């Protein structure tokens, strides 16, 4: 018996999340606790990478806020994620979109896949 696998299965959230990949624009509803109050924050941006495997899988979302790029890493199995919605399906040729960090304006746009 592998004790690590037993512990991972016990703490797994088993949420049904939509499938998405790098280049997709998604909205993550994330639960934030401030003091004794709790609220849900919507974080919308482009997925620039998906890394890890299994329960340790995580994804990085990049958004522009007041002309400043903000990146946030979310674990897939986080109990604080309320929901994930896919807004746009991007058309990219790379798995990791680190080159978006250096681009600004219209150059940083990603082509949209026709659905």
Swiss-Prot record:
<keyword id="KW-0689">Ribosomal protein</keyword>
<keyword id="KW-0687">Ribonucleoprotein</keyword>
<protein>
    <recommendedName>
        <fullName>Large ribosomal subunit protein bL19</fullName>
    </recommendedName>
</protein>
<dbReference type="InterPro" id="IPR001857">
    <property type="entry name" value="Ribosomal_bL19"/>
</dbReference>
<dbReference type="GO" id="GO:0006412">
    <property type="term" value="P:translation"/>
</dbReference>
<dbReference type="InterPro" id="IPR018257">
    <property type="entry name" value="Ribosomal_bL19_CS"/>
</dbReference>
<comment type="similarity">
    <text>Belongs to the bacterial ribosomal protein bL19 family.</text>
</comment>
<dbReference type="InterPro" id="IPR038657">
    <property type="entry name" value="Ribosomal_bL19_sf"/>
</dbReference>
<dbReference type="GO" id="GO:0003735">
    <property type="term" value="F:structural constituent of ribosome"/>
</dbReference>
<dbReference type="InterPro" id="IPR008991">
    <property type="entry name" value="Translation_prot_SH3-like_sf"/>
</dbReference>
<dbReference type="Pfam" id="PF01245">
    <property type="entry name" value="Ribosomal_L19"/>
</dbReference>
<dbReference type="GO" id="GO:0022625">
    <property type="term" value="C:cytosolic large ribosomal subunit"/>
</dbReference>
<comment type="function">
    <text>This protein is located at the 30S-50S ribosomal subunit interface and may play a role in the structure and function of the aminoacyl-tRNA binding site.</text>
</comment>
